[in-house]
Amino acid sequence: MNNKNESVTSVDVIISGLGPTGATLAHLLGKRGLSVLVLEREPMFYGNARAVYTDDECMRVMQAAGVAAELSANMQVDTPAQWVLANGKILGQYWRLDRPYGWPIINFLYQPWLETTLSDLLERYPNVRVARGRELTQFTQDEHGVTVTHQATSTFRFSDATDARQACEVDPDPQTIRGRYLVGADGGRSTVREALGIGMSGKNFPEPWLVVDLEMKEGEDALRHLPYFSFICDPDCPTVCCPQPGRFHRFEFMLMPGQTREQMEDPTVVRNLISRYVDPDKFEVKRKLVYTFNALVAKDWRKGRVLIAGDAAHMTPQFMGQGMSSGVRDAYNLAWKIDAVIKGQAGERLLDTYGSERFHHAKAMIDISVQMKDFVSMSSPVSSLMRNLLVRTVLATPFLGRYVREGRFKPAPTYVPDSYLGMPRRHRRSPEGRMIPQPEVRTFKGQRVLLDDLLGDGFALIGLEVDPRVHLSQASRKLLDIQNTRFATLFPFGARPQGADTDRSNTSELLELEDVQGEMVAWFKRSGFSSGAVAVVRPDKFTFAMVEAADLNRAINELKFQLQWSPGAEVVADEPRLLRKIA
């Protein structure tokens, strides 16, 4: 990755912002071979933790981006989340150890480590360049692309550029660059969103909270008694107690009526608050900040060739840990669609499904986060007592208790009807518009591999005990080849055909897989299908269709229609392209 501000005339995609959303998008696009320029206004990495958690869906995205192993090595996983009373007794607990999407459901992280890792790993792509200390100032667009003007950040100090890894050589003069598309991943105060005139709907919450980030001093062992994530439901001082990897820990305290920002950020007050839970002499306070939060979502996510993502598109209260995760989901949804349009594999209308799909899911995450905030931050003794009685009653009820203990109140990765790229659902359990499971499967060589690592980055056809290729017309096969589709036959564990003439496995042609854990076979059955059915899977691992093999060509015709693909459309070779530079 070239961090120097060399003159570049054009790229495929310009990204404004190198936070988790922008960095994830850069990885996904870079892996697909597109040329990318990322403009990051901060000349050096912003070293404070903000996000502390991500989930299995987002780790699946990081797997697709090729960075999951490096990130998970520095995460704390499978940590129970608890609702705790003021006296220390547990009111309720949420935890799951299964892996429906291939990764732990609960992953606590230290954001400076995560962002540094994402940024450093972009160096593997010669077609991706990060320009630090550069901020987007204006842009214009036409039917062919976007022209972006960027300049040295107004607060940039040239002494900041002494760190070659984190800074760039900065030309103080404005520069312009041409891109096929511009993505504004530039945060809640998005310059891109404001320039587009896109408004946001939702609510601003006036209730302030004090966040205190701690780092345990070297040689100390002062966090052993706080192994879990806890909402401390104390009506006198609602508190969040959050473990993080390494020596880090976070507390959040809700301000009560009459308490001010100046009072609560006072070092003595901070010391008194954290001393309820830890010995303050064994910690360094990395950050203390009073903040309020927003629950907002943008009314539009695309205008022409300019799109917004992450906090620029939605602002999520922190109480479900879904702010960063929602932005990562945006990147996954958007990356393959931009790639397909640029390479002539789909028409531009495909990009409209980005907003229609992601809006409702992001809004659902915002809503559940607000509900969780209301649940844990009750300051009335009467309301708190009623809440505690309700929780105990729910947990004593078998179905509802399981629903709460397993965290099934969190919105599933499912798109609302009539909003998604895919065939309509026939019944409540139809898989269309839903993320497919990701178990380990067994290859014909006897290796156990996560399913996505075999399906790749394009479309996939998975036949249950049937070779989907056999049922494809010539026209269907042509479309699927254009989409870089992979084909798989899935067998129940131990049921793969044997004999000298049955081993047809070829990773470029047909994957013969065994469902070791039984999750995929169960998924077909839940959807109302058995042997002989085929699932058409999108590049982001959502289901386009599930049909009987005899109806497969009908589903592929529908795919062709929804992609707006037609023979003769330009298809760009799927190879990395170096940034095009002025001679």
Task: Show which residues each predicted segment covers.
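N-terminal Rossmann-fold NAD(P) dinucleotide-binding loop
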Residues: 22-23
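Glycine-rich FAD pyrophosphate-binding loop
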Residues: 30-50
